Amino acid sequence: MCLGRVKSAMANQELFEKTGIKQCVIQEIIQLAQKYDVQKVILFGSRARGDYKLKSDIDLAFQGGKGNYFSFDVDEETSTLLQFDIIDLDKPVQDELLESINREGIILYEKV
């Protein structure tokens, strides 16, 4: 359910305007990251660049934690019908994809 506010490097409204992702969906992703002890969640791809289309998927990369549970629940328990493409950075990742994540990624959550 969409409640609460997002605490992110970007202001809430700025994040929504750039990515087109509702504040509540970002908050749900953050809560799942905390639940499954994920260390870091990065938004990348067209939504991070701001050149997404209405039905563009949400590309996420993450490090640490219980990745299988996190990936499954993000797909099943967030308040959006958009598809997710989720990359586990603790597994082998193509160099080009890793460069793209590092270049354009927006950190949504980082455990301190």
How would you label these PLM feature ranges?
Residues 1-40, 48-54, 63-112:
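Catalytic core of pol beta-like nucleotidyltransferases
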